[in-house]
């Protein structure tokens, strides 16, 4: 399950309700949707194809619809990062750079795990997420993404525009999800 680790003092929060309560103060959404409804072969398949993607999105159709209606999102896709991903280290170098977005960064973890370090007040809080968990990092929040020791994650991403996201590293440097 999720875990918050505060870099300044090493404090750890592991209780899901405490995590949800703490993060909500800063506009970060945390929720648990679970993965029990997905067959293991679909969940664990990192060779993503259209059939696999459709099965995953259909399994979470209700939650995705509610999220879209509540937050104004319009589209979703599946993203996979693993040792099979071409140029994984290059992608991770980009994701590990501190940035923000003009839209929320929405991820539901289907399988695997990862870490979203987020700047909160004068600290950096590592938000560890695992399969079955939803994280929404709000627009404007300074953050980055890291794979953990498992080096794999499979997520549903949700967007407000068909173009997806644009990372803003500083005033003069951006990257889009297509870079």
UniProtKB/Swiss-Prot annotation:
Residues with site note (May play a role in transmitting local conformational changes): 104
Annotated protein name in UniProt: Acireductone dioxygenase
Family in the record: Belongs to the acireductone dioxygenase (ARD) family.
InterPro entries associated with the record: ARD, ARD_bac, RmlC-like_jellyroll, RmlC_Cupin_sf
Cofactor: record remark: Binds 1 Fe(2+) cation per monomer. Binds 1 nickel ion per monomer.
PANTHER family: ACIREDUCTONE DIOXYGENASE
Required co-factors: Fe(2+); Ni(2+)
Site location (May play a role in metal incorporation in vivo): 98
EC number: 1.13.11.54, 1.13.11.53
Biological processes annotated in GO: L-methionine salvage from methylthioadenosine; L-methionine salvage from S-adenosylmethionine
Pfam families for this protein: ARD
Organism: Sulfurihydrogenibium sp. (strain YO3AOP1)
Gene3D superfamilies: Jelly Rolls (2.60.120.10)
GO terms assigned for molecular function: acireductone dioxygenase (Ni2+-requiring) activity; acireductone dioxygenase [iron(II)-requiring] activity; iron ion binding; nickel cation binding
Keywords of the record: Amino-acid biosynthesis, Dioxygenase, Iron, Metal-binding, Methionine biosynthesis, Nickel, Oxidoreductase
Catalytic activity: 1,2-dihydroxy-5-(methylsulfanyl)pent-1-en-3-one + O2 = 3-(methylsulfanyl)propanoate + CO + formate + 2 H(+); 1,2-dihydroxy-5-(methylsulfanyl)pent-1-en-3-one + O2 = 4-methylsulfanyl-2-oxobutanoate + formate + 2 H(+)
Pathway: Amino-acid biosynthesis; L-methionine biosynthesis via salvage pathway; L-methionine from S-methyl-5-thio-alpha-D-ribose 1-phosphate: step 5/6
Function: Catalyzes 2 different reactions between oxygen and the acireductone 1,2-dihydroxy-3-keto-5-methylthiopentene (DHK-MTPene) depending upon the metal bound in the active site. Fe-containing acireductone dioxygenase (Fe-ARD) produces formate and 2-keto-4-methylthiobutyrate (KMTB), the alpha-ketoacid precursor of methionine in the methionine recycle pathway. Ni-containing acireductone dioxygenase (Ni-ARD) produces methylthiopropionate, carbon monoxide and formate, and does not lie on the methionine recycle pathway.
Binding site for Fe(2+): 99, 101, 105, 143
Chain positions recorded as Ni(2+) binding sites: 99, 101, 105, 143
Top-level taxon of the source organism: Bacteria
Annotated positions for site Important to generate the dianion: 107
Oligomer and partners: Monomer.
